[in-house]
């Protein structure tokens, strides 16, 4: 699994846990719906740290909490 796929899955997981839609997440995070849709659809292969930080702020969690999920433990090495 790539970091992009893991971020997508983590965002979806957090939305499910909090019972919020992706549209609501975009609004409370201050990012555009299209940016979030690109992350979730996989069109955005490398989400920026600043976008993840905005999502974390919207969810009222730390970046550390976002990345502490087990899904990030066994990522593939990505060489560009």
Model regions and ranges:
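A short, Lys/Arg-rich alpha-helix, primarily the initiator
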Residues: 1-20
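The alpha-helix within a helix-turn-helix
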Residues: 15, 26, 56
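Recognition helix of helix-turn-helix/homeodomain-like DNA-binding domains
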Residues: 31-46
């Amino acid at each position: 699994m790539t970091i992009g796929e893991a971020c997508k899955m983590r965002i979806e997981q957090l939305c499910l846990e909090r019972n919020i839609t992706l549209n609501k997440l975009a609004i409370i995070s201050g990012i555009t719906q299209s940016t979030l849709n690109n992350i979730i659809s996989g069109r955005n292969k490398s989400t920026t740290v600043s976008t993840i930080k905005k999502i974390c702020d919207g969810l009222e969690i730390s970046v550390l909490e976002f990345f502490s999920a087990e899904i990030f433990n066994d990522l593939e090495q990505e060489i560009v």
